Curated annotation (Swiss-Prot):
Family to which this protein belongs: Belongs to the metallo-beta-lactamase superfamily. Glyoxalase II family.
Molecular functions (GO terms): hydroxyacylglutathione hydrolase activity; metal ion binding
Pathway annotation from the record: Secondary metabolite metabolism; methylglyoxal degradation; (R)-lactate from methylglyoxal: step 2/2
Protein source organism: Hahella chejuensis (strain KCTC 2396)
Coiled-coil region list: none
Known EC number: 3.1.2.6
Name of the protein described by the UniProt record: Hydroxyacylglutathione hydrolase
Protein encoded by which gene: gloB
Co-factor requirement: Zn(2+)
Oligomeric form and interacting partners: Monomer.
Top-rank lineage group of the source organism: Bacteria
Reactions catalysed: an S-(2-hydroxyacyl)glutathione + H2O = a 2-hydroxy carboxylate + glutathione + H(+)
Length: 257
């Protein structure tokens, strides 16, 4: 059976290892090679491929060292500047990995070359979304604009509600503190925060999250919600006439929160 395990890196990154009981492994966004090499050795795994969501160094910094030890395919966006990519991808492509395959979704906003990978693994839908969607949050807009990012998030919102979300950072508690500021009376936010505080106190990741639950407490997926819009209006001093305006206002608020 295939399982998905987090490999912690740096202060708050997760490199996701998709591994089969036959000893094959694919890793997502290896910003650091050393923890991946240790994980492979300790679990007697053979690296079969590297999946990249975007070009930032904390997601790609370990690629060349891994390739020096394991010459495997590197998957990434077709117009990315990452030189190590050997299998360029675009929207709708499928990546065949052993007994399963992942669909490529273009999700720009955080960066222009950002893609996500979605598919059924071990009987459940899974999404590897890098820095586009976080639990209770979303990525900063380093290269894209609010309309672009909101379009990407809307694309992800349309995935099945039982989709497990494997994002690349342990930002959940920080994001939930912001969500409480946006929706101070939300039972869903408060419940999720208590759950995650308990997990982190035991050293357990808050991920994967579940998409159908995120839609109830992630303010960046709730730009149409009247409470979110009202708080965006108060903080920004603008009318927030559209959901994209609301999204832009709360993203700017989060940047300085």
């Amino acid at each position: 059976m295939t399982e998905i395990l987090p490999i912690p890196a740096f202060n708050d990154n997760y490199i996701w290892s998709i591994q089969s009981d036959q000893g094959d492994a694919w890793v997502v966004d290896p910003g650091d090679a050393q923890p991946v090499l240790r994980h492979l050795a300790e679990n007697h795994l053979t690296l079969r491929g590297i999946l990249i969501t975007h070009h930032h160094h904390d997601h790609t910094g370990g690629v060349n060292e891994l390739l020096a030890n394991h010459p495997v395919p590197v998957y990434g966006f077709m117009r990315s500047a990452i030189k190590a990519i050997t299998v360029p991808l675009q929207e709708g492509d499928r990546v065949d990995l052993g007994d399963f395959s992942l669909e490529v979704l273009e999700t720009p906003g955080h960066t222009l070359d950002h893609i996500s990978y979605f598919g059924d693994i071990a009987g459940a839908p899974r999404l590897f979304c890098g820095d586009t969607l976080f639990s209770a949050g979303c990525g900063r807009l380093f290269e894209g604009d609010p309309a672009m990012m909101r379009q990407s998030l809307d694309k992800l919102k349309r995935l099945p509600g039982d989709t497990y979300i494997y994002c690349a950072h342990e930002y959940t508690l920080s994001n939930l503190r912001f969500a409480q500021a946006v929706m101070p009376e939300s039972d869903e936010v408060n419940k999720r925060k208590l759950q995650c505080e308990s997990l982190r106190a035991r050293g357990v990741p808050t991920l994967p999250a579940v998409l159908g639950e995120e839609i109830a407490y992630n303010p960046f997926l709730m730009a149409e919600h009247p409470v979110v819009r009202r708080m965006a209006q108060e903080v920004s001093g603008s009318p927030c006439a559209t959901a994209t305006d609301t999204f832009a206002a709360i993203r700017a608020w989060k940047d300085r929160f």
